[in-house]
Amino acid sequence: MDNYAVFGNPIKQSKSPFIHTLFAQQTQEKIVYSAIEPATDDFKTALKDFFLEQGKGCNITAPFKEQAYQYAQQLTERAALAGAVNTLKLTDDGIIIGDNTDGAGLVLDLKNNNVTLKGSRILLIGAGGAARGVCGPLLAEHPKELIIANRTFSKAQTLTTIFTKLGNISACEFSELSGEFDLIINSTSASLHGEVPLIGTKLIRPETTIYDMMYSAQVTPFNAWAKEQGAKFILDGLGMLVGQAAESFAIWRGVKPDAKQVLNELRHHLAT
């Protein structure tokens, strides 16, 4: 069997082994998938050992995505733009390729939920690594406008500079946001701390899709707040997690698993 893994610290909360085991069963691919937690200063050594011990590929989560970016011998275009790597693959030629499937996972989940991206007006809250990882794939869907709002305005401006050639992207202060949005994505970790980003309630209409990249067994604080403002269609990041994993699996094995089926099983697993 071929060996795959997820690297992170901490890693015990990771759902990746559960997800990829289901993918393997679904596609009848013979793989073993484990979770590895190196010390924060020992990541590259652990990665080297993994590939020396017949590892074929791995997922990377916090806090190692930037280090994985540096470790990769080749980068895909989307990984280069994202400035971070969440998927590594060892090719038959012995080359380690770095990719970033986060944005593809988000877009897949949005499409699976019948969210129209082409011609839409999108607000992306936050300008950290999570936001940078999804800007390219979102712009590839040709939205009318992608606006980034962040507490530190200069960080939002930096992202617009990186992605300006890919589509209509701009930065905006929270206080200057206006009009209504078709899709509002929260890429910050505010929900993990029980907080809600400071955006005006007038930006949300009943038809606005609300997407929090965070997830939990309960409704996230951001999604609960949006629901109070009248939003009827809210999604959390669990589907993105499964979607990016499906993309990684396809990169490694050449077969795309059914993310919807595994998402349903994972949600049931979280609820029990």
From Swiss-Prot:
<feature type="binding site">
    <location>
        <position position="86"/>
    </location>
    <ligand>
        <name>shikimate</name>
    </ligand>
</feature>
<dbReference type="GO" id="GO:0009423">
    <property type="term" value="P:chorismate biosynthetic process"/>
</dbReference>
<feature type="binding site">
    <location>
        <position position="213"/>
    </location>
    <ligand>
        <name>NADP(+)</name>
    </ligand>
</feature>
<dbReference type="GO" id="GO:0050661">
    <property type="term" value="F:NADP binding"/>
</dbReference>
<dbReference type="InterPro" id="IPR046346">
    <property type="entry name" value="Aminoacid_DH-like_N_sf"/>
</dbReference>
<feature type="binding site">
    <location>
        <position position="61"/>
    </location>
    <ligand>
        <name>shikimate</name>
    </ligand>
</feature>
<dbReference type="InterPro" id="IPR041121">
    <property type="entry name" value="SDH_C"/>
</dbReference>
<comment type="pathway">
    <text>Metabolic intermediate biosynthesis; chorismate biosynthesis; chorismate from D-erythrose 4-phosphate and phosphoenolpyruvate: step 4/7.</text>
</comment>
<keyword id="KW-0057">Aromatic amino acid biosynthesis</keyword>
<dbReference type="InterPro" id="IPR006151">
    <property type="entry name" value="Shikm_DH/Glu-tRNA_Rdtase"/>
</dbReference>
<dbReference type="InterPro" id="IPR013708">
    <property type="entry name" value="Shikimate_DH-bd_N"/>
</dbReference>
<feature type="binding site">
    <location>
        <position position="215"/>
    </location>
    <ligand>
        <name>shikimate</name>
    </ligand>
</feature>
<dbReference type="GO" id="GO:0019632">
    <property type="term" value="P:shikimate metabolic process"/>
</dbReference>
<dbReference type="Pfam" id="PF01488">
    <property type="entry name" value="Shikimate_DH"/>
</dbReference>
<dbReference type="Pfam" id="PF18317">
    <property type="entry name" value="SDH_C"/>
</dbReference>
<dbReference type="GO" id="GO:0008652">
    <property type="term" value="P:amino acid biosynthetic process"/>
</dbReference>
<comment type="similarity">
    <text>Belongs to the shikimate dehydrogenase family.</text>
</comment>
<feature type="binding site">
    <location>
        <begin position="126"/>
        <end position="130"/>
    </location>
    <ligand>
        <name>NADP(+)</name>
    </ligand>
</feature>
<comment type="subunit">
    <text>Homodimer.</text>
</comment>
<dbReference type="InterPro" id="IPR011342">
    <property type="entry name" value="Shikimate_DH"/>
</dbReference>
<feature type="binding site">
    <location>
        <position position="102"/>
    </location>
    <ligand>
        <name>shikimate</name>
    </ligand>
</feature>
<feature type="active site" description="Proton acceptor">
    <location>
        <position position="65"/>
    </location>
</feature>
<feature type="binding site">
    <location>
        <begin position="150"/>
        <end position="155"/>
    </location>
    <ligand>
        <name>NADP(+)</name>
    </ligand>
</feature>
<feature type="binding site">
    <location>
        <begin position="14"/>
        <end position="16"/>
    </location>
    <ligand>
        <name>shikimate</name>
    </ligand>
</feature>
<dbReference type="Pfam" id="PF08501">
    <property type="entry name" value="Shikimate_dh_N"/>
</dbReference>
<dbReference type="GO" id="GO:0009073">
    <property type="term" value="P:aromatic amino acid family biosynthetic process"/>
</dbReference>
<feature type="binding site">
    <location>
        <position position="237"/>
    </location>
    <ligand>
        <name>NADP(+)</name>
    </ligand>
</feature>
<keyword id="KW-0028">Amino-acid biosynthesis</keyword>
<comment type="function">
    <text>Involved in the biosynthesis of the chorismate, which leads to the biosynthesis of aromatic amino acids. Catalyzes the reversible NADPH linked reduction of 3-dehydroshikimate (DHSA) to yield shikimate (SA).</text>
</comment>
<feature type="binding site">
    <location>
        <position position="77"/>
    </location>
    <ligand>
        <name>NADP(+)</name>
    </ligand>
</feature>
<keyword id="KW-0521">NADP</keyword>
<dbReference type="GO" id="GO:0005829">
    <property type="term" value="C:cytosol"/>
</dbReference>
<keyword id="KW-0560">Oxidoreductase</keyword>
<dbReference type="InterPro" id="IPR036291">
    <property type="entry name" value="NAD(P)-bd_dom_sf"/>
</dbReference>
<dbReference type="InterPro" id="IPR022893">
    <property type="entry name" value="Shikimate_DH_fam"/>
</dbReference>
<dbReference type="GO" id="GO:0004764">
    <property type="term" value="F:shikimate 3-dehydrogenase (NADP+) activity"/>
</dbReference>
<protein>
    <recommendedName>
        <fullName>Shikimate dehydrogenase (NADP(+))</fullName>
        <ecNumber>1.1.1.25</ecNumber>
    </recommendedName>
</protein>
